Amino acid sequence: MILSRVSSAIEMNVCLEEKLEKIGVSANKNPLTVCFVCTGNTCRSPMAEAVLNQLGHVPEFCTACPPELLDRRGIIACSAGIAALEGMPISQNAVAALEKNGIRVTPNNNYPAHTAHQISESDLLTCDLIVGISASHTMALMTAFPQYASKITCLAENIPDPFGGTLEDYEACLEKIRHAVGLMFYGDENA
């Protein structure tokens, strides 16, 4: 059943709007909180977090968002891992790829200081949306936290793990993340 839910979400590219409606996100709650989840929380999910934190707002042209959310609140992203070693630093190649590709370090987006965090029930309680970086992460989340299935979704594209790869591998991964995050939150792969 869980695998079929994950497959359906990927095949039908379930809209963020539908997810928000299902979990009852209120237009009065600021900001929309999104948690990206990968395996170790040192490469893909912190890069997705940094990308969305740089975008950081719900634009008026967002095709995936309910009208009552448009330009009325920001988005704050965080990240976690399904098998994270608490406190491990972000991969230096992830930092280098983000910097090289114009993701700014700001007080609200201080990704070089990121340390790995193991996903917990409190994350699912406090975040509006939990986004698996791949179908396998989404399936693991739904298995571990079935009571929060309505908050859990997946990027439309599985993002390969660059762990241990070259800077070029991380840059290719970042490009896929930007594309997937842009499509999910802004209806535009070039957001």
Which residues does each PLM region occupy?
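Short polar/charged helix/loop
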Residues: I2-A191
